[in-house]
Amino acid sequence: MSTDTPVPSPQGDYVPAVAHDGVVYTAGMTPRVDGVLLCTGRVGDGIDLELARRAAAVAAANALAAVRSVAPDGAELRCLKMTVFIACGAEFTALSSVADGATGALVGQLGERGRPARSAIGVSSLPSGAPVEVELVCAA
């Protein structure tokens, strides 16, 4: 995954990331490429596991781009906590497998400093019909 991912434009009245006392918090990032969602729908119901993992990777790359946009120049980033929200039905239980796509994107860019503590949470819907949304907290 490229380290030159542009910061996604906010889809509402918020900023992509906020830095405070050496910690960066991101807004929820969806899998947008050039402002367009990679896919829409619910995982396990039109979105298969492979596509969901790819969408999670794109969302995580977007979150990391948001972190970099407010982190001090030259900061050695360390991903502390990631929350991956997955739009799915009650019967879908491979949440951690979807979130592994997001973790892989972070580790691909930052090495072991990109491997965060993590939660994977199933939800009924996400903004604009996105299948995944990623929030990231990083030390900068």
Range-by-range predicted roles:
Residues 1-83, 88-140:
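N-terminal presequence-like segments and the immediate start of the first folded domain
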